[in-house]
């Protein structure tokens, strides 16, 4: 059995009120077009053809070499859009799925079931339908007394009886490929919209006594077509529920799943605990046994097993097992933390590698640094890595002790087991096993304060 797919993605999406093409609006981190294409891949199409039009280069870039593309210069209806794919598919034997690029909730499982139904019933056309609580605005499925599909009638063309029907057309179909393009040559624009309706091919097939069927979706939500921001928010809500439920089934605990945002490509191992208001984006992975507390935000990062991240932001970073972060820490892109590192409150790390069991507990900035293992970084330590034009590296050896309020001016190397005195400004290499003091000697002038204006004795 050879399958093909046509994805309709040419429309502007006027009701979205956006410069961005409709199919490029995102749901749970992926564009709607990407969601649709991933589901389409479940039927293993021999060729996928995407119909593009408005801002076509932007749309093309999303799928790149995964699809063939045809251009619809004028948007003259769904039938016209499918006609554009004729140059790619005409005359080929097989079954062709036609689906809109603004239906992000459709699942690959449903599309596989649709194809199987179509083949098993030897249909020339099969319509994916759903039972709508409120069918207004949808094309209705009209059946005869034997349950066979007679036609699809659009809302503006439906009579009073047809408007009462609950079974609606989702806009997704499977056709015998050859017959599809033969029938498209016979449709006209004689309707209320003055467009080429793809649905008119159903009447053509029926007139030829060819078999047309309908496969009803189990979940009406899958049929949602996104035409405005309200529908986009609905799709986001449904997708978020699917994602959190999938992770719960796989052994993840959520304290308040309704407040958690997890994107589609995030992976989470079993026995992870996620509190409320956590955001996980991009290609993030969370290792087994890790705890993410309220307010944590992680994007494109790998978090190892048995870590604890407390109300912190992590971007494009890698954390090994047993790392603790936060509260209120910020790991910026290029950060790597080895096993059992502790990054405490109000610590920022960027573009740095920190060795195992090193601790930076408070109020510290580590940028463009290589820090060894079992290092203590005292409160208030700052790596001075930028001179206004270039970034420079700081290297700290194993078991070094960086005293509180140290200023490390890069480029700089501090050797193994070295110690910097609190309050020091260090700008030259510190050899291993050395103590360095880089501050002014304390001077105390007894009784001198009485001569200053702030002293209580001066106010008399």
Curated annotation (Swiss-Prot):
Residues 251-460 are annotated as: N-acetyltransferase. Its cofactor is Mg(2+). It is an enzyme of class 2 (transferase). InterPro entries: Bifunctional_GlmU (IPR005882), GlmU-like (IPR050065), GlmU_C_LbH (IPR038009), Hexapep (IPR001451), NTP_transferase_dom (IPR005835), Nucleotide-diphossugar_trans (IPR029044), Trimer_LpxA-like_sf (IPR011004). Its EC number is 2.7.7.23, 2.3.1.157. It holds the Pfam family NTP_transferase. It catalyses: alpha-D-glucosamine 1-phosphate + acetyl-CoA = N-acetyl-alpha-D-glucosamine 1-phosphate + CoA + H(+); N-acetyl-alpha-D-glucosamine 1-phosphate + UTP + H(+) = UDP-N-acetyl-alpha-D-glucosamine + diphosphate. Residues 230-250 are annotated as: Linker. UDP-N-acetyl-alpha-D-glucosamine binds at residues 8-11, 22, 72, 77-78, 139, 154, 169, 227, 332, 350, 365, 376. Residues 1-229 are annotated as: Pyrophosphorylase. The active site is at 362 (proton acceptor). Mg(2+) binds at residues 102, 227. One of its GO terms (cellular component) is membrane. Keywords: Acyltransferase, Cell shape, Cell wall biogenesis/degradation, Cytoplasm, Magnesium, Metal-binding, Multifunctional enzyme, Nucleotidyltransferase, Peptidoglycan synthesis, Repeat, Transferase. Catalyzes the last two sequential reactions in the de novo biosynthetic pathway for UDP-N-acetylglucosamine (UDP-GlcNAc). The C-terminal domain catalyzes the transfer of acetyl group from acetyl coenzyme A to glucosamine-1-phosphate (GlcN-1-P) to produce N-acetylglucosamine-1-phosphate (GlcNAc-1-P), which is converted into UDP-GlcNAc by the transfer of uridine 5-monophosphate (from uridine 5-triphosphate), a reaction catalyzed by the N-terminal domain. In the N-terminal section; belongs to the N-acetylglucosamine-1-phosphate uridyltransferase family. In the C-terminal section; belongs to the transferase hexapeptide repeat family. This is Bifunctional protein GlmU.
């Amino acid at each position: 059995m050879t399958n093909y797919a046509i994805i309709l993605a040419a429309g502007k999406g006027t009701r979205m009120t956006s410069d961005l093409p409709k199919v490029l609006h995102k749901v749970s981190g992926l564009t709607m077009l990407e969601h649709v294409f991933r589901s389409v891949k479940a039927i293993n199409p021999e060729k996928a053809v995407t119909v593009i039009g408005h801002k076509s280069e932007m749309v093309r870039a999303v799928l790149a070499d995964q699809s063939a593309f045809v251009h619809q210069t004028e948007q003259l209806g769904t039938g016209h859009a499918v006609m554009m794919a004729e140059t790619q598919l005409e005359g080929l034997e097989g079954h062709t799925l036609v689906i809109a690029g603004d239906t992000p909730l459709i699942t690959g499982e449903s599309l596989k079931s649709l194809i199987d139904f179509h083949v098993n019933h030897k249909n020339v056309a099969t319509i994916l339908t759903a039972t709508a609580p409120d069918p207004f605005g949808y094309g209705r499925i009209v059946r005869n007394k034997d349950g066979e599909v007679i036609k699809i009638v659009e809302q503006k063309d439906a009579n009073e009886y047809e408007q009462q029907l609950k079974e609606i057309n989702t806009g997704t179909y499977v056709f015998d490929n050859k017959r599809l393009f033969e029938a498209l040559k016979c449709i006209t624009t004689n309707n209320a919209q003055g467009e080429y309706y793809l649905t008119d091919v159903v009447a053509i097939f029926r007139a030829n006594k060819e078999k047309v069927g309908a496969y009803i979706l189990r979940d009406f939500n899958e049929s949602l077509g996104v035409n405005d921001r309200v529908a986009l928010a609905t799709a986001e809500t449904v997708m978020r529920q699917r994602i959190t439920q999938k992770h719960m089934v796989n052994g993840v605990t959520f304290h308040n799943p309704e407040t958690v945002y997890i994107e589609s490509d995030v992976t989470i191992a079993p026995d992870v605990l996620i509190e409320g208001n956590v955001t996980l984006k991009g290609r993030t992975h969370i290792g087994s046994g890790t705890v993410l507390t309220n307010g944590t935000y992680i994007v494109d990062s790998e978090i190892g097993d048995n870590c604890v991240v407390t109300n912190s932001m992590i971007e494009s970073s890698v954390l090994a097992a047993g790392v603790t972060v936060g509260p209120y820490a910020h790991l910026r892109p290029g950060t790597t933390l080895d096993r059992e590192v502790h990054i405490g409150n109000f610590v920022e790390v960027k573009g740095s590698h920190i060795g195992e069991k090193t601790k930076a507990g408070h109020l510290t900035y580590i940028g463009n640094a290589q820090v060894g293992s079992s290092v203590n970084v005292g409160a208030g330590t700052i790596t001075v890595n930028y001179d206004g034009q270039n970034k420079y590296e700081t290297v700290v050896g194993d078991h070094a002790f960086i005293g509180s309020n140290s200023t490390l001016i890069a480029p700089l190397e501090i050797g193994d087991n070295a110690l910097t005195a609190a309050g020091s400004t260090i700008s030259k290499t510190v050899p291993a096993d050395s103590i360095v003091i880089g501050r002014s000697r304390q001077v105390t002038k007894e009784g001198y304060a009485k001569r200053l204006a702030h002293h209580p004795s001066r106010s008399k």
